[in-house]
A protein has these predicted regions:
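Boundary/junction segments of secreted and surface-exposed precursor proteins
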Residues: 4-110, 114, 316-323
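Sequence contexts marking disulfide-bonded cysteines in secreted/extracellular proteins
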Residues: 12-14, 30-34, 40-42, 67-73, ...
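Beta-sandwich strand segments
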Residues: 14-21, 69, 73, 90-97, ...
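Short amphipathic, basic-aromatic surface patches that mediate peripheral association
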Residues: 64, 81-166, 176-185, 294
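Short beta-strand elements
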Residues: 127, 132, 161-163, 297-320
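Exoplasmic/lumenal beta-rich domain surfaces
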Residues: 172-173, 181-277, 290
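A short tyrosine-centered beta-strand micro-motif
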Residues: 175, 278-289, 369
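Proline- and Ser/Thr-rich low-complexity, intrinsically disordered segments
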Residues: 319-369
Length: 369
């Protein structure tokens, strides 16, 4: 009997040691393209956000009342959520703080700067002491016959998080609490009740899709309660491509093919703010990964998911709730002018002092509304 390690088995489909964009090697010999029979193709990632992890990880989601005390102090009016982002694609999601030439790139206002810093050890500050943002470099690998090659492109920004001690990709996931609307299939178009931060992640290989901890998170469909579970290496054309060891390095981070990153609800920023006056009842938690489409993937249409969730610790159902009112302009009217007033909180029904039952009303007279 001959024992072959996984790393040996993947030896002819690897990105390890690939530092030259157009080099000659045999590192892609056994890599498979998405289309059968092709020998020249991008090996792109396909990152999703897992509805099963959003629904069950760490026994969440966890809802807190508007006034929280004791063990939940500091979570007033929060709905804590977990984000898991599996990569079910043919190649790794690889983002880098250092490009192929050893340069790091920064944005200072409207200006772009670069420094040669191959190990990412130098400190850079904008000349005007303004906000410093480092540009993310995405490396996209390509199979050209037996050769593994790559291109690089800018893909958004990242920020150093002192509380975590490493860089996070900016705007990696967003979470919102929404009301489902009949005849609108896309949850991203549903009315927003509450939002959270645009959360940045340090991207790493946290769980394998084949592990007990990651089982069920990786599926071939992003829709709630749908999709075949991908928990076998044979279900991925290039399982492990990327190295299965990405971490929070300032030089290179990512998610290998067949792996996922997980940010638990216990971490900083992993919550949705529930507005005061929100009624108990049925809602949806909507999550989206890479909402700005900064990263190049094989499928850009499966980057969101939505799960049902029932609020139980807010205002009693059908109690009327409360609503902040916002206007589309300065609420001072001259003769012939109009202003649009909108209820800030999304709801199923509305009742204005004018008798109107729409979320927004247009008024042309001063008064209390």
């Amino acid at each position: 009997m001959v024992t072959v390690s996984l790393s040996d088995a993947l030896g002819q489909c690897t990105v390890s040691g690939i530092t030259t964009p157009n080099g000659t090697n045999t590192s892609a010999t056994s890599c498979l393209c998405e289309t059968a029979g092709q020998t020249d193709c991008d090996l792109r990632p396909d990152v999703m956000i897992a509805w099963s992890a959003l629904q069950t990880y760490a026994s969440g989601p966890s809802e807190y009342p508007q006034v929280c005390s004791g063990g939940c102090s500091g979570n007033d009016g929060r709905l804590r959520v977990t984000g898991a982002t599996p990569n079910i694609g043919n190649g790794p999601l690889n983002f880098r703080g250092v490009d192929k030439d050893g340069k790091r790139w920064f944005i200072c206002g409207t200006d772009t700067f670069s420094i040669v810093d191959p190990n990412s050890t130098q400190t850079f500050s904008c000349p005007n002491s303004g906000l410093t943002k480092q540009l993310v470099v995405q490396r996209v690998y390509r199979k050209v016959g037996n050769n593994m090659r790559f291109t690089e492109r800018f893909a958004g920004t990242m920020t150093y998080h002192p509380s975590h001690g490493h860089n996070h990709v900016d705007d990696w996931v967003t979470f919102s609490l929404r009301l489902a609307i009949a005849n609108e299939p896309n949850p991203l178009n549903w009315p927003i009740v509450g939002t959270g931060a645009k959360v940045g992640f340090c991207l790493m290989d946290y769980f394998s899709c084949t592990s007990a901890s990651g089982n069920g998170h990786c599926r071939n469909d992003h829709i709630y309660n749908q999709g075949t579970v991908l928990n076998q290496q044979s279900q991925f054309q290039n399982f492990g491509l990327g190295g299965q060891a990405y971490n929070c390095s300032p030089v290179s981070q990512g998610i290998s093919a067949g792996w996922e990153d997980v940010y638990s609800e216990s971490l900083d920023g992993m919550w949705i703010n529930i507005p005061p006056g929100t009624c108990n009842g049925s809602y949806y938690i909507v999550a989206q990964v890479d909402p700005l489409n900064n990263f190049l993937e094989s499928n850009e249409n499966n980057n969101w998911t939505a799960i049902p969730f029932t609020l139980t610790q807010q205002a009693p159902a059908n109690s009327g709730g409360t609503c902040g009112i916002i206007s589309d302009r300065e609420p001072v009217l001259c003769s012939g002018e109009q202003v649009v007033l909108t209820c800030q909180n999304a709801g199923y029904t509305y009742l204005w002092s004018t008798g109107a039952t729409t979320r927004s009303i247009t008024v042309d007279q001063g008064g209390n509304y």
